[in-house]
Each structure stands twice: as structure tokens, then as C-alpha cells.
């Protein structure tokens, strides 16, 4: 379980102080897929960086399985982070390492014996559908394949939590659907708690059990995904839903090919949990 209590994060000093997060309070249950939804500049990235202490909060607590990680000293951070995997929009792979050696990298840092780390990496590559890609390099992979390598690497230390920071923003709609399907599979089969940071209503709608809407560094709305989207209470969420409807109307398919593409792109976890990730 993740409990965030009265979290504040400010940048700068004195008159130049900018409060990025104001009194954030959240409880994320173990095994949940929890979405943090917001527009650019809303505070999403600041929150996720505080959650794994890439940045320390100005005040407040982040309690994971009963332990307040904000009290951990810098020299002990590496141990805390082994329990928190993270993937990013830009994949962040090592271009000079093979796919296999990208996945083994966190295990190398933990001094895991070579045989065990390669066994773990090969298992994870099979899990994400890349068992035949171990000796390739990132430059030889598509964007979706690179993100799957990043997912495998994030799982290397068998974390109980994975933070996904705009993990599908650089991908097309079809590949996004495939990656969301994979993340849902990981959540179900490995019982990994997923925290999905996104600006996309479609992503939140299709994978998240619950969603917190963040705006101006504050949680303005929180609840079950379907209920929240059916009956939004905040101005920002109502505006985003209205904008989405308008955009969908403008992009309405005009032929069978477009309809087929739309159906494929919306074949996300809640609609197609059993589909194989290509």
C-alpha cells in the first residue's frame, strides 16, 4: 500500500518560491492500477518523482507498506528504489548495450551473479514478448519494443510497485493499446501495483481502477474511473471530457478502413485482456 500524507513540494526560495504540489493526500491499495491524470504543468511529474525520491518533498510523508520513505537517508535510497520500478516516455535505454544487458543492468548494480541475472532477464523478455530479441540493440527496435524492454528492466528487481510516467505518450494509438494490455497483464499475473501518470483520458479510462485528477498541484477529484468519467465534478475534468468529445467528433472515421483502425486502437485492457501483445 502507498499512503501519501500532506505532501508539499516547492521549488526556489523566498519570493521566487513556486509550489508545485499542495497538500497531496492519496491512498493506493496494493495490486491496484491507479491513475494520476492532469494536463501539462499540473504537477504529475513532480508527484511521481517524489514517490520514488528522485526529488525529496518539501514536507509530508510517503508511506510504502508501513515505512515512511521520506525518512530514508540518501545512502539508503538504492535499497528503497529496488522495490519501485519506473518507466518513462522516452524509454531511457542504453544504446550501447544489447536488449539482454539493458534488462540485467539493475541486477548488475545489486551484484546479482551473472547466471541468475541472465535467467531473470530472459524470463522477463519472454514475459514482455521479446524472448527472441535478447541480442539486438535498442536502435534495431520499434518504439513499442523499446518500451517493452524498459518495462522488463523496471521489473528486474521484482518490485511491488511500478511508476509509469507518460509511458505511452510517444507511441501511436495501436502500440499504446498493446503496451497498456501488457501492463494490465503484469498487474494481474505479478500483482504489481501500477501508478499510471498520464494526460490522456483514454489511457486512464482503459486501464485504471481509480483516478486522481490533479490541477495546479492539487488533487481536485478522486474516485472510481467509470464513475468519475460519467459524472465529473471538477471544472478541469469536465473541460477535458468536452474537448475529447469534440476531438473525437472531428476525427470521426469516414470509411471502413478508418473504422477498423479505431476498433484496433481501442482494443485496450478493459476490452481485450486476453489479446497477445504483438
Which residues does each predicted region cover?
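C-terminal boundary and immediately downstream tail of ABC-type ATPase nucleotide-binding domains
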Residues: 230-259, 263, 267, 271-278
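ABC family nucleotide-binding domain
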Residues: 2-4, 8-208, 212-216, 220, ...
Amino acid at each position: 500500500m502507498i499512503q501519501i500524507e500532506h505532501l508539499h513540494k516547492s521549488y526556489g526560495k523566498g519570493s521566487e518560491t513556486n509550489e508545485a504540489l499542495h497538500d497531496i493526500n492519496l491512498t493506493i491499495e496494493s495490486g491496484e492500477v491507479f491513475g494520476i491524470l492532469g494536463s501539462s504543468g499540473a504537477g504529475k511529474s513532480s508527484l511521481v518523482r517524489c514517490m520514488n525520491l528522485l526529488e525529496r518533498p518539501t514536507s509530508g510523508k510517503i508511506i510504502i507498506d508501513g515505512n515512511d520513505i521520506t525518512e530514508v537517508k540518501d545512502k539508503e535510497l538504492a535499497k528503497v528504489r529496488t522495490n519501485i520500478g519506473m518507466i518513462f516516455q522516452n524509454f531511457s535505454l542504453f544504446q550501447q548495450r544489447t536488449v539482454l544487458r539493458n534488462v540485467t543492468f539493475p541486477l548488475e548494480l545489486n551484484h546479482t551473479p551473472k547466471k541468475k541475472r541472465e535467467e531473470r532477464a530472459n524470463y522477463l523478455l519472454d514475459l514482455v514478448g521479446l524472448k527472441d530479441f535478447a541480442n539486438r540493440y535498442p536502435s534495431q527496435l520499434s518504439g513499442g519494443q523499446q518500451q517493452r524492454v524498459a518495462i522488463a528492466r523496471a521489473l528486474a528487481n521484482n518490485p511491488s510497485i511500478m511508476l509509469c510516467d507518460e509511458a505511452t505518450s510517444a507511441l501511436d494509438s495501436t502500440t499504446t493499446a498493446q503496451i497498456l494490455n501488457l501492463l494490465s497483464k503484469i498487474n494481474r499475473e505479478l500483482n504489481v501495483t501500477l501508478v499510471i501518470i498520464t494526460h490522456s483520458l483514454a489511457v486512464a479510462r482503459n486501464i485504471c481502477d481509480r483516478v486522481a485528477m490533479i490541477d495546479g498541484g492539487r488533487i481536485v477529484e478522486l474516485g472510481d474511473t467509470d464513475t468519475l468519467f460519467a459524472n465529473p465534478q471538477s471544472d478541469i475534468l469536465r473541460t477535458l471530457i468536452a474537448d475529447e468529445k469534440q476531438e473525437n467528433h472531428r476525427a470521426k472515421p469516414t470509411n471502413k478502413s478508418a473504422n477498423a483502425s479505431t476498433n484496433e486502437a481501442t482494443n485496450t485492457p478493459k476490452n481485450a485482456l486476453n489479446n497477445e501483445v504483438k
